[in-house]
Amino acid sequence: METARLFKLVCVICIASLIPTIRANVADETDEYWVNKANEARKHTLMAYHPDPYEIVDHFHERHYDNSTDVEGTEEEKAVASEEEDVIEMISSPTNSTRRSLTGRGKGKGKGKWSKLTGPCTASNPIDKCWRCQPDWARRRKKLVHCVRGFGYRTTGGKRGRIYVVTSPRDDDMVNPRPGTLRHAVIQKEPLWIVFKHDMSIRLSQELMITSDKTIDARGANVHIAYGAGITMQYVHNIIIHGLHVHHIVKSSGGLIRDSINHFGHRGEADGDGISIFGATNIWLDHISMSKCQDGLIDAIMGSTAITISNSHFTHHNDVMLLGAQNNNMDDKKMQVTVAYNHFGKGLVQRMPRVRWGFVHVVNNDYTHWELYAIGGSQGPTILSHGNRFIAPPHKQHYREVTKRDYASESEWKNWNWRSEKDVFMNNAYFRQSGNPHFKCSHSRQQMIKPKNGMAVSKLTKYAGALDCRVGKAC
C-alpha cells in the first residue's frame, strides 16, 4: 500500500513538473486572459487545418508567379500604401546602408561568409522569383505576402496595416516598452508591417511576445536577435518573420512581461528557443539565419499549424527543429508544416525536423551533414520527402541513415507514411521508407508541378539565410 501511494505521489510530481512547459511559461495558469487566448487559438487551428493536406502539397508545386504583374492589392490597400510613402522614403535612403548586395552562401574567405556580387541578381526558387531582383522591392515590401507557398500560404502578416519603423535596439522595459523599439511594435493591436531604420543588434531581456497580424521585415538592414531571450508566438495567428539573424539565444528568467497593449502578466523561465511557436497558426518564417541557441532553433508545438519555413540557413546546433513536443497531445494531429528551400548546414546534430503526429512536407532542402540523423519522428506522423539532397557525415558510417523513429517498434512504424521521392543521397546516406509503397497524393491535380530533383538543391538553396539587401538595388 505504501509503495502504491509513493508511486502515485511520484506521478503527481512528474506531471506537475511538466505544467510550465505545457503552459508555455504562463506562471498563472488560471489567468482568464490566457485561458481565453488558448480557446481562441484552438478555433484558429481548426480554421487553418486543411482536411486534404495533399492539395496543399500540390499548391506548393503548382503555383506560378508572373513577376510583371502588379499585385499591390485592392484600392484600399493602394491608398494605405500611398499614405506610407513618406515613411518608406525615410528608410529607403541609400545612406542608411553601406553594405553590398548579396550573392548568396559563398565559398569565399571565412566560413559562412557571404561572397561578393560578381554578376546580375538571380533568384533561384519560386518563392524568391516572386519578389527578388527587382530594384523597387523596398517600395513594394508588401508584395512579399503574395510569395508564400506551402501550408502557410494564407499568411499575410501586417499587409493591411501601416509601416512601423524600429529606430532603437533597446529592450529595457518589459511592461511599458519604449516607442520605436521592436517590443513596442509587436504588442500593438492592429496589423503592422515592421521594418528597421538601420542595422542593429537587439539583446532581448525577456522573450519577445508577438501579437497577431504582424510582419517583421528586416530587408535593407542587418538585424540580429542575439545574446538574450528568443521570439515567442503564443496563441496568435498570421505572422511573417523575414530576414533576421537569430543566434546565441539563452534562457531568460521570466517576470512581468507585456504581451499585448491590454495585458501583461508573469511569465516563467523561457528555455532558450530561438523561435517558439505555441498554439499559433498561419506562420511564415523566410530567409532566417539561425545558430547556437540554448534549446531549439525552432519549436512549433501545441496545435500549431499552417506553417511554412523556407529559405533559411541553420548551423551549429543540436536540436534544430521540433514539430510537436508531447506524445499525448492530440492537437498536434492537426499540425501541417512545409519545410522548403532551406540549407541545413555545418555543425548540426539532429531534428531537421523531428515530428510528432503531424503532416510535414520536406521539399528541396540541402542537408550537408548531420551528427545523429536528419529527419525523425514518433506518434505516426506523415513525412513526405521530395527532392532533397542528403549528404551523410563522411566519418560516421553508423549515422548515415537520414531517418530515425522513436517510441515505436518496427511492427508499428512500418505503417507510418514516410516517403522519399526525387531525393539525392551522397556518402551512402539512405532514407528508410515506410507505409504504403504505392502511396500517392489522391487529390485534384489542376496545376500539378512536381518538385525539382534533389540534384537542383544547391541552386535552389543558394541564397538561404538572411539576405544582405541594399535599398535601391536588386536584392
From Swiss-Prot:
The reactions it catalyses are: Eliminative cleavage of (1->4)-alpha-D-galacturonan to give oligosaccharides with 4-deoxy-alpha-D-galact-4-enuronosyl groups at their non-reducing ends
Which BP terms in the Gene Ontology apply to this protein? pectin catabolic process
Q: Which UniProt keywords apply?
A: Calcium, Glycoprotein, Lyase, Metal-binding, Signal
Q: Which InterPro entries match?
A: AmbAllergen (IPR018082), Pec_lyase (IPR002022), Pec_lyase_N (IPR007524), Pectin_lyas_fold (IPR012334), Pectin_lyase_fold/virulence (IPR011050), PEL (IPR045032)
The segments labelled Disordered in the record are 91-117
Active site (catalytic residues): R351
Gene3D superfamilies in alphabetical order: Single-stranded right-handed beta-helix, Pectin lyase-like
| Record keyword Calcium present | yes
Cofactor binding notes = Binds 1 Ca(2+) ion. Required for its activity.
Query: Which residues does the record list as glycosylated?
Result: N67, N96
Tell me which EC number(s) this protein carries.
4.2.2.2
Check the record and name the Pfam families matching this protein: Pec_lyase_N, Pectate_lyase_4
Name the needed cofactors: Ca(2+)
Gene Ontology molecular function, alphabetical: metal ion binding; pectate lyase activity
Which pathway is this protein assigned to?
Answer: Glycan metabolism; pectin degradation; 2-dehydro-3-deoxy-D-gluconate from pectin: step 2/5
Signal peptide from the UniProt entry: 1-24
Q: Binding of Ca(2+): at which residues?
A: D271, D295, D299
SUPFAM superfamilies annotated for this entry?
Answer: Pectin lyase-like
Q: Which family does it belong to?
A: Belongs to the polysaccharide lyase 1 family.
Name the record gives this protein: Probable pectate lyase 7
Instruction: Report the source organism.
Output: Arabidopsis thaliana (Mouse-ear cress)
